[in-house]
Amino acid sequence: MDEPPSDVLAFLRQHPSLRLLPNTRKVRCSLTGHELPCRLPELQEYTRGKKYQRLSSSFSNFDYAAFEPHIVPSTKNRHQLFCKLTLRHINKSPEHVLRHTQGRRYQRALHQYEECQKQGVEYVPACLLHKRKKREDQTNSDELPGQRTGFWEPASSDEEDALSDDSMTDLYPPELFTKRELGKPKNDDTPEDFLTDQQDEKPEHSEEKSFREREEARVGHKRGRKLRKKQLTSLTKKFKSYHHKPKNFSSFKQLGR
């Protein structure tokens, strides 16, 4: 890009508050932050204005170092300043610096900074505290009490006993679950071990009856299997005859006619 004319460069050297913006045809005033075209007539008219005359006379010897260490040059933009108390960027002009330092946000942050210095506590800007609190609230809302699932643990001995007691013995007659103690003779005095009068008189008849019942059950089971087999074969034959296609399709059509 071509450089401005020599008369424009000479005029800019006479007014240090006017700075030429790189890669543009514009000039920025550091006192007001105003941008104007890089042409000599516009620059002369701007410098003759009342606002520029007032600011240039009052801020000709403005000391930016007086606001350090809270306001320092910005590392991102060399034409701006950065406030460490409010984490804000400020235009490098006396008017903007004074407006920021006299504002409520800066004064509140400066008061908190001084209190932290007295107590020996590190100062944290308010915006960082707000972000940190918001992050903690989100983590607490994600992990509500009572919703966290614990790790699996093996059951204790009491729980195992309770599970073992949960049998289905109450659904069956108690005679099936009577236990005979070891080491005792068979002819014990317990009432369960004595035979009734009918069992004592006809033990052989009861054995023959149980044998006959087992034989009848076996024969009935065989008959049931044969009957089911016959029904299955008849069903398969009907299914095959229904879904069987004729070999000659033309003959089938003739029969249909």
Curated annotation (Swiss-Prot):
The keyword Phosphoprotein applies. Signal peptide: none annotated. The modification Phosphoserine is found at residue 93. InterPro entries: Surf2. Residues 177-189, 199-219 have a biased composition (Basic and acidic residues). Residues 220-247 have a biased composition (Basic residues). Residues 248-257 have a biased composition (Polar residues). It holds the Pfam family SURF2. Keywords: Phosphoprotein. It comes from the Eukaryota. Coiled coil: none annotated. Belongs to the SURF2 family. This is Surfeit locus protein 2. It comes from Mus musculus. The gene is Surf2.
